[in-house]
Structures are given as C-alpha cells and as structure tokens.
C-alpha cells in the first residue's frame, strides 16, 4: 500500500481550558462502560437556546479537496467536493451544551447501539433529548456553512440522523497501557493491528459533517483515513474540539482510526442530502438498518423520499400543462423517461426497506464497501455474537 498522505489539523481558539476527565459508571450493556466526566457541561443552564451569533465559531477551511484530486471520475458523487480540511465550526459553549445533552442518562439508556462496524454509537435521540443539538444542525446559518463547503445546497437527511455519536472511551490505566504497547511495537518494527473506532465503510448518505466533541490536546492518531481512487490512502487528521470536517462519504471508503493518549474520542456526525428534489438521492440504508429503530427509520426515509417524488410529479405536471397551453406537441418520450426514472427511484426505495425479520440487529454486511480487498477483509472477520 502506498504511503498515506496527511492533512494538517486546524487549531481553534479558546478550547485549551476545557479538558474532560474520566470517571467510572455502571456499564450499559456489559460491553461499553461510559467513563466520561461531563461535569463542566452539567453546570450550565438546562434550557440553553442555540444562538448562531454566540454558538457558531466558523472559520473557512484552508483547503477543500475535490473528488478529482482524490482520483475519482467526474460522474462520481453529487458534488465536485470530496473532503475538507478540519475547520472551526462551534464555540466552546456550544460544545459543552452538546456534550451535556448527548451524554445524558436518557440518551445512553434509550439510544445506544453497537455493531460489527462500531462498538458504541448513540443515534436518533436529538428531537427528544437534545434540542440544542437539533436546533444547531437545523439552523439556516449552520446549513449555509456546510452547504458552501460541500459545494451544493444541503439539508439534514432526516431527524434520525441528526447528531449521530461515535464513542471510544477508556480508563487512564488503559490509555497508558495502549501508549506503552504502541511504543513497544514501533520500537520492534511490528505492524500494530489497531481496532478502529469505526471500521472501513461508505456512508449511507451523500454528505456528512463530522464534529469533534473531545479535547484532542494529547491525542495521538484518531485520523480519518480515506481510500482514494488509485487505492492509496489519505489520512485526514482528526479535528480539534469544536472543529469539523465535511466529507462526501457515500462515495468514498473511509475508516475512523483508533486514538491514543486520550481517555475519550467522541465525534458527532450529521448526515446530509441535496435540498433540490431534481438532484439524485443515492441514499442507502445498508450501514444504518442494524443500528436503528427500524419503524422510525423507515417512516422518516419514506416521508422524505415520497416528498421528493411528490415535488418531482408536481413539477412535471406543471411542465406538461404549460406545454399544452402553449399549444406545443406532447413529448411522449420525455414523459416516458421521467416515469422510468421514478420507477427506478421507487424500486430503490423498496429495496432499501428490508423486512424487519430479515434484519440482524448489530450486523452490517459488506455490500456498502467498494473495494474487493476490503470486502474480503470484512468476510474474514469473525461474525460477532449478537446479544
């Protein structure tokens, strides 16, 4: 494999004073033990309203890498943009409030999921238990920032995918042991088979914005590795607390690598799709079916897809009526092409809504991967025991 390129991190102002410390708590499912101390956030008022003038801390990324620069063909994706460098997005006050909401007992109790791709994820909680998080990602100013970087007008794909959390936590003792093991293996020239936070995958949705909720001052590693069109690897160094990365992750294989030197790595991922109903919606549910409340996921997926179809039909109906009033001949072939596209749209939608009794909770197959070697690697991994 070719040597990996790297993107240097962008350091945000005013975050050095907020450093979370670990504490112990009861395990939620016998595997994951939340040890994150969130006391700084808990001291805040319970009803903090998102205010973009206070809580946005945006500075444009120094560079945005195009799909072409990453080695992909012009027809891949819904935008020319591949991935941005890390950039400051939210203030320290915003991050504290987000941590307060997402690390609450109710979220851990009702919205924690795990799979063979990622050990600990929190999903679907924003409308009920995280109003600040919900409003932050629905705010027009936030959407304008993400859309400008992505090179296309975007909206959150659906409420269920607002504020998805990936978590890796360990005790101080575990942190020190991992550092010592990594140093020993490096000295002996061994290749360390690191367990990633989120294994190789493509996203189910066109774009994601990945926000760092942890202090990364002493963190080693923790990058997101992207597979380029020529199969080489580009490592995007993890953003600092309050910083984010915009990625067209539906079309690029990527992995969240393990971080050393820190007791936690918590990222928030919000997924986006094009606002325009006339643009393709390549959403799949491959990587999210097994880690979701399926009836809710299917309802929200159906709702927005049928809204897209409704808008397309209304637009086409207006077009043929206008042509009739203008005494233009009816274009049969144009309508047949439109109908075929909508048939394919509905067939794809039907395919993604797999019957609930055929979905294995916590297990995602390799159909989301693009590269044969990664598919083969995935097949060789032992299928986890579902508890």
Regions found by a protein language model. Name each.
Residues 1-59, 282-387:
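Intrinsically disordered terminal extensions flanking catalytic oxygenase cores
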Residues 39-76, 101-115, 122:
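Short acidic N-proximal helix/loop "leader" segments that mark the beginning
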Residues 83-166:
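Signature of the catalytic double-stranded beta-helix
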Residues 151-153, 195-200, 257:
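Catalytic micro-motifs at enzyme active sites that drive phosphoryl/nucleotidyl and oxygen chemistry
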Residues 160, 194-207, 232, 239-240:
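A short beta-loop-beta micro-motif enriched in histidine and acidic residues
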Residues 161-195, 219-225:
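Active-site-proximal segments of catalytic enzyme domains
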Residues 199-219, 271-274:
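Short, conserved beta-strand element in jelly-roll/cupin
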Residues 219-321:
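Catalytic core of Fe(II)/2-oxoglutarate
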